[in-house]
């Protein structure tokens, strides 16, 4: 669709660029899109507007203040430090020069977080006699806060905005090819497009993207189930600057499209193929071999993938940039593939092998080679893993912050006692590890003796269906972990009491009655309320104990010391036991 131009208006052709943060009081919806949540290499360009009449000159006899001689780049940088749109508006009204250098900051990312705002912005964009050409000032447009309201008709005024760099339409399900195509046509500056969950979109829109958006760096079409290889191949051939590609749930995509991206888009840093169940080993091998800068590869539920995807990699290959690999539910992945992955990607930070049911201790021993690089590891439902492997993993990778061992039914207190030595552990998942007891929880709760770690770093602990746990361990955990914001105890009998479940969050609406009866998850303020309640309950008992204590405190201390010594001696008899005091950071 042809774009109309009114040359009498102010234009926003930018003589310079600034990468500084330029949007005061950003709305909540501004940072929700897939690309802006990450360190996107593409920064929105903010420039000065051009005057209506470029021949207007200042009176040569007029004495101007020094600030009038600053170049636009410096003025824009100064104005970008202002914290509110009201302050920017005040500056805009000072003089023509300030107006030209403020207006872009006000308009580059308009707040469309409610319907009234959106209507006002749309009206201003379509106004024929406005002082500025606002359509050319908008660089980021995010309509994801109005998912139920936005339709093809809503976006018609924005079809004039041909300098948009980031367009976010997440979950705007009423949009069709008509509305999205109108926004895309002529958008030569578009760098990031998020149309996730627009299930009515077809190849038509993606062909328009391929024709118009050769600067595109980020594309998120999660859930666009009607998109096929045909349009994706066109995108790969015309948008060769792509860095981030999210095809989560695009069920018709096959190796044909993925191989085309591997061949034509060498700058890809992140690719998500979750639930792309037609993708096979050939695609994975090609991506890992060809994309030297690849940082994230997500293959969750790509069930056709097996060991060959990694064993067929060239022996010399070293993917030193790869940081995240997600193989959730790739059930045919075995130990040999994990060994090859670790040797080829020695700097992996996040490794997800949840539901890779055939891996054993051998795979975990291979993961140990990642050492201090490993921060996040998910081994849920890997039921062949034993204590010895987990203990060695902790010894080798002491910077782990997140570990999930849900349904690893062979693990005992020995594993958790070793996990308790991790100085930076924030989240631990032990759901259905039914052999663990209060000894594990007391180990996690034990105060750190290392002065560099003043208190536990634990924030989320998942203990549902750990049926041997009692109030003693959990109470100690609550009091020792001030940062705790999530505690799941579903199915733990000691906590299915009405006076405690009142602090739980509501069960999800889709749960059955039986699931609701055992649901027990504390989060946010609920954790604090549970802690306070248990402490109040314990206070009378503590007072009673203090009233019957021996007068001879030295004798009592001596008895306690003997008991403590026996307990420590018993623990040390275990050859694989390590003192649970966290090591020095």
UniProtKB/Swiss-Prot annotation:
Sequence ranges of Polar residues compositional bias: 1-10
GO cellular component, one term: cytoplasm
Protein name: SCF E3 ubiquitin ligase complex F-box protein grrA
Region (Disordered): 1-34, 41-60
Subcellular location as annotated: Cytoplasm
Pfam families associated with the record: F-box-like (PF12937), LRR_6 (PF13516)
Tissue spec. comment: Specifically expressed in ascus mother cells.
Keywords: Cytoplasm, Leucine-rich repeat, Meiosis, Repeat, Sporulation, Ubl conjugation pathway
Induction details: During ascospore formation within the cleistothecium.
Quaternary context: Part of a SCF E3 ubiquitin ligase complex.
Cited InterPro entries: F-box-like_dom_sf, F-box_dom, F-box_LRR-repeat, Leu-rich_rpt, Leu-rich_rpt_Cys-con_subtyp, LRR_dom_sf
Ranges of residues in domain F-box: 65-113
PANTHER family: MITOCHONDRIAL ATP SYNTHASE COUPLING FACTOR B, SCF E3 UBIQUITIN LIGASE COMPLEX F-BOX PROTEIN POF2
Compositional bias ranges of the Low complexity kind: 11-25
Keyword Cytoplasm belongs to the record: yes
Disulfide bonds: none
GO biological process terms on file: ascospore formation
Function description: Involved in meiosis and required for ascospore formation. Involved in substrate recognition in ubiquitin-dependent degradation.
Primary location class: cytoplasm
The organism's place on the tree of life at top rank: Eukaryota
Sequence ranges of the LRR repeats: 147-171, 172-197, 198-223, 224-249, 250-275, 276-301, 302-329, 330-355, 356-381, 382-407, 408-432, 433-465, 466-491
Organism: Emericella nidulans (strain FGSC A4 / ATCC 38163 / CBS 112.46 / NRRL 194 / M139) (Aspergillus nidulans)
